[in-house]
Curated annotation (Swiss-Prot):
Pathway: Cell wall biogenesis; peptidoglycan biosynthesis. UDP-N-acetyl-alpha-D-glucosamine binds at residues 11-13, 117, 160, 208, 310. This is UDP-N-acetylglucosamine--N-acetylmuramyl-(pentapeptide) pyrophosphoryl-undecaprenol N-acetylglucosamine transferase. InterPro entries: GlcNAc_MurG, Glyco_trans_28_C, GlycoTrans_28_N, RPE4. The gene is murG.
Length: 376
């Protein structure tokens, strides 16, 4: 049985798409090994069929500290790959892939890199000259070297199976018109039962680097929104830290808004299924999932994201009329409230955005697996 190594780490945005790819490759008869770092250890579940290996590489701004750490990690990776004898190594970008990719090059194992964002990251750009193929999610990608263009294959991103299994709901059947909200998520705590079946549901999540901001911004925006349109029937599903939930509950309760909170959503499919509109960061995996099911979003890109890639992701979607980009440095509760009200008041805008999203959807798990098989 041929062995394939996948390398991803740092955040769930890199981890979960790689797991989804691994599951597709296992179905095709390959033995899949996944090298990740300590930060992603928390995401590993017993029912995942890929074989995990933890190889941690701590970052440091001091080059004299980082190089010895990198050297040790590369030696460990060389030993690991030498014993495995893989047919190919696939890297998903970010500094956790550096050591395994160097090891693959040293052992002359073919490498493929996958860039999830609309801006080629530094690590992927470095390894582009060594890669057999470069899989990308966006046909229009920034920071791509001229020599790498011949290696490009547009595969789209890889979406988790439970998201792919979601039935795509037409936007015209959502929201304030005929959308039924009776099946409000039972898995979450702090749920207030819907008053009727015509609630407009907004799903808000920001990951570890967005939840705090959203816990302050969103309630303030909803207060303004309800002042402008008191007759709105809203349902809010929101990621929030426990410390913030009491304050937010008080605000939503006074506004007579249906709500549900969680610190972390284990099954995003459940929340997506309920939502009419998403407010989130603009990470690549989030965008791919929303694209796959045709669910429009207001994106607030993380300003500190490497190479400002989240801004480029969100701006590209806005240019394609598939989403809306509000920059964190320029946003206010009033601006966000106005945008939400505009979208709720004009269902056709949401419907058009949904259809535009579905037009750009790709079966990334299959296309990337096909590409890997071509290289082997």
């Amino acid at each position: 049985m041929k062995k394939i190594i996948l390398v991803a780490g740092g955040t769930g945005g890199h981890f979960f798409p790689a797991v989804a790819l691994g599951e597709e490759l296992i179905k095709r008869g390959y033995e899949v090994h996944f090298i990740t770092d300590l930060r992603c250890k928390q995401y590993i579940k017993q029912d995942m069929k890929v074989i995990f290996h933890i190889l941690d590489l701590k970052r440091s701004g001091n080059i004299f500290l980082f190089l010895p750490r990198l050297s040790i990690a590369v030696l460990k990776a060389i030993k690991l790959l030498y014993n495995m004898k893989p047919s190919v190594t696939v890297g998903f970008g970010g500094y956790p892939v550096i050591a395994p990719m160097f090891a693959a090059i040293f052992l002359r194992v073919p490498i493929i890199i996958h860039e999830q964002n609309s801006y080629l990251g530094k690590v992927n750009k470095f390894f582009a000259s060594f890669a057999k193929k470069i899989a990308i999610s966006y046909a229009k990608i920034k920071n791509l070297p001229e020599f790498a263009k011949s290696k490009i294959v547009v595969t789209g991103g890889v979406v988790r199976e439970n998201i792919r299994e979601l039935k795509v709901i037409e936007m015209s059947s959502r929201g304030l018109t005929t959308g039924s909200k009776k099946s409000l998520i039972k898995a979450l705590d702090s749920v207030v039962k819907p008053r009727n079946d015509k609630l407009f549901t907004i799903f808000i999540f920001g990951g570890s680097q967005g939840a705090k901001l959203f816990s302050e911004l969103i309630p303030a925006s909803i207060q303004i929104l309800m002042q402008k349109q008191p007759s709105l029937e809203l349902n809010i599903i929101q990621q929030a830290a426990l410390d913030d939930q009491v304050k937010i509950k008080d605000i939503y309760s006074k506004l007579n808004i249906t709500y549900a909170f969680a610190e972390f959503f284990d099954n995003m499919a459940l929340q997506y299924k309920e939502a009419d509109l998403v407010i989130s960061r603009a990470g690549a995996s989030t965008i791919e999932e929303l694209t796959y099911i045709g669910l429009p979003a207001i994106f607030i890109p993380l300003p500190s994201a490497a190479d400002n890639h989240q801004y480029y992701n969100a701006q590209l979607l806005e240019d394609e009329k598939t989403g809306w980009c509000l920059e964190q440095n320029n946003i206010s509760a009033g601006k966000l409230a106005d945008k939400i009200l505009e979208l709720i008041s004009n269902p056709k805008i949401l419907e058009d955005a949904s259809q535009n999203l579905l037009k750009r959807r790709k079966e990334g798990h299959k296309l990337l697996s096909n590409l890997i098989e071509e290289v082997i």
